[in-house]
Amino acid sequence: MLFRSVKKMYPDYTVVAYINTTSELKTICDVCVTSSSAVQIVKNIENKNILFIPDCNLGKWVADQVPEKNIKLLQGGCPTHVRMSKRDVEKAQKAHPDALLLVHPECLPEVSELADYRGSTTGIMDYAKKSDAKEFIIGTENSIVQHLQFACPDKQFYPLSRDCVCHNMKLTTLGDVYQCVKGTGGEEIKLDEEVRIKAKRCIDTM
């Protein structure tokens, strides 16, 4: 695994991995984080030196809020969130000048820097529900726009980009899970037991 070589370059660093990483990668990481828990977990790590993987945009967002830490970033990223650009922001704000811009920290800095709010999907949804504003441009996976419109019918929500669709997220449906549990379809994924045990450690530490 290439990352083992990278880790050897930073032997005194605590390795923080985003939850959306492979099981194999989790086996050599110290702790997992979600976008909503990343800042607090990094703050609570005793070690000043942090190697944050794999999303450099999420990592930069964390680093900005925890300046007391020495955070090294790798050049990974979410292929869905990085599709959105400053041009998309300009276009959306021109179409909806009264709307607040709420974006996920996995977006490019050129997008995040223009936002009225940056946060996890849960954070975005909570902010929109509690806000007195009536219009919002949403810079994350487009299904969140639909969830918000259903939850807040008195407000208007617009996708920052109609291209912000995560096809990987949509590969597995509730029906697939149901069929798999029944044994009539779907696909059961089985992990090597050694990998499972090692990967579980950094999840438990979270």
Annotated model-derived regions:
Residues V6-Y10:
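Acidic (Asp/Glu)-rich catalytic clusters
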Residues P11-T14, N47-I50, P97-L100, S131-F136:
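Short active-site oxyanion
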Residues V15-I19, E24-T27, V31-S35, I41, ...:
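General beta-strand structural signal in soluble alpha/beta enzymes
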Residues Q40-D64, E90-P97:
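Internal active-site segments that recognize and position negatively charged phosphoryl groups
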Residues T122-G123, S131-A133, T140-M206:
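C-terminal functional extensions of proteins
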